[in-house]
Amino acid sequence: MPRRRVVGQRKILPDPKFHNELLAKFINILMVDGKKSTAEKIVYGALDILAQKSEKDQLELFEEALDNIRPSVEVKSRRVGGSTYQVPVEVRPVRRNALAMRWLVEAARKRGEKSMAQRLANEMLDASDSKGSAVKKREDVHRMADANKAFAHYRW
């Protein structure tokens, strides 16, 4: 624990095109080696593909995809008396968003399509339909937490 003061979370500026803070955070998570304009091109390209493929609003689809990926519980390792238990704990809202975005980017990177924008768009479409590897990752995390429900009393 810090002895002085706890530093507050930095306010993130909304993205230039849609003026959405969540999308700006997503662009930052996708960014590699500080190349923000490249990350923006990829995300906006993916959203344009989403707009063409679906009659729904592209931002709405993005939000829906994230909703289907967000985990509500996860497991954390806790050492008790020489043995390590996987203790299920609830995920804080900020971490929920961060994990969902990270899993979406990882799943998109593993896909086989040619461009990253195409991969991201298809993964978002899959996630909004509750399928795809990002949603599978969430299911796995939830299953792991459910399997270790017996150790929930070790929560701290």
Curated annotation (Swiss-Prot):
GO terms for cellular component: small ribosomal subunit. It comes from the Bacteria. One of its GO terms (molecular function) is rRNA binding. It holds the Pfam family Ribosomal_S7. GO terms for biological process: translation. Keywords: Ribonucleoprotein, Ribosomal protein, RNA-binding, rRNA-binding, tRNA-binding. One of the primary rRNA binding proteins, it binds directly to 16S rRNA where it nucleates assembly of the head domain of the 30S subunit. Is located at the subunit interface close to the decoding center, probably blocks exit of the E-site tRNA. Belongs to the universal ribosomal protein uS7 family. Part of the 30S ribosomal subunit. Contacts proteins S9 and S11. NCBIfam families: rpsG_bact (TIGR01029). This is Small ribosomal subunit protein uS7. It comes from Colwellia psychrerythraea (strain 34H / ATCC BAA-681) (Vibrio psychroerythus).
